[in-house]
């Protein structure tokens, strides 16, 4: 599942590899997947995407945006894997969506458990979790302070576990079950411990673990349980890039 470190990694890779490429053909699923969700009919995606140029990509919480010409946005998330192939590479047999570009390279979207591949012709995305991701302060940002985290804890039901506090309802956009396991391990906090019984020191330790774990994961290109644009999670940071350059 795409979580914040992979979202940031993937959006950077799309910017580096795909910006300026124009979509020439759209191929729909060769193996329909009942838990792949689309915005409207995927059979109409060709009309919406062919001729559009990828301008940029942005990552918000659990969402990766492909910003296209003519104000079109393609938006993916959850269990969607995206792989970029060079011209002449063998086309995989199974996929949920395939885009070809003007240089004969192509982009393949597949879904494991569940995921969404949406296209919005007017850039308007009516999704409460997307709005939350856009409007919230990223935990990677210096603006996400301990005061922000304390507010989150104060507003949570005290019967919530530490794991549920971090991993459910997108309270912190882009933080799910995957990264939460590492955050709690690094904080040395039992996932089942109730928020009510977290001491002030534990809250401080948990906040620091949240920030440091996400920054480290993102800097290293995401978790090694996920794949990136090239089917591997490699360290994509530039030689001069530091952890402070992530957002």
Regions from the PLM with identified roles:
Residues 89-93, 143, 156, 173:
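Short, amphipathic alpha-helical segments
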């Amino acid at each position: 599942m795409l979580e914040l470190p992979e979202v940031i990694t993937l959006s950077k890779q799309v910017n580096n590899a795909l910006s300026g490429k124009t979509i020439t053909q759209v191929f729909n699923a060769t193996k329909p997947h009942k838990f792949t969700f689309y915005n409207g009919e995927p059979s109409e995606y060709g009309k919406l995407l062919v001729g559009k140029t990828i301008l940029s990509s942005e990552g918000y919480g659990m969402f990766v945006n492909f910003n296209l010409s003519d104000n079109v946005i393609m938006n993916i998330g959850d269990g969607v894997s995206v792989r970029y192939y060079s011209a002449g590479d063998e086309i995989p047999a199974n996929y949920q969506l395939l885009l070809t570009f003007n240089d004969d390279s192509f982009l393949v979207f597949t879904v494991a458990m569940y995921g969404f591949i949406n296209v919005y012709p007017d850039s308007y995305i009516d999704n409460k979790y997307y709005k939350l991701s856009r409007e919230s302060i990223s935990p990677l940002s210096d603006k996400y302070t301990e005061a922000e985290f304390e507010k989150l804890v104060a507003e949570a039901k005290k019967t919530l576990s530490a794991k549920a506090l971090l991993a459910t309802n997108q309270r912190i956009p882009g933080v799910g079950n995957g990264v939460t396991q590492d955050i709690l391990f690094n904080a040395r906090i039992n996932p089942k411990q109730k928020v009510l019984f977290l001491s002030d020191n534990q809250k401080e330790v948990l906040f620091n673990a949240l920030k440091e774990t996400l920054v480290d994961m993102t800097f290293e290109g995401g978790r090694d349980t996920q794949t990136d644009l090239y089917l591997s999670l490699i360290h994509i940071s530039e030689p001069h890039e530091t952890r402070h350059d992530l957002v």
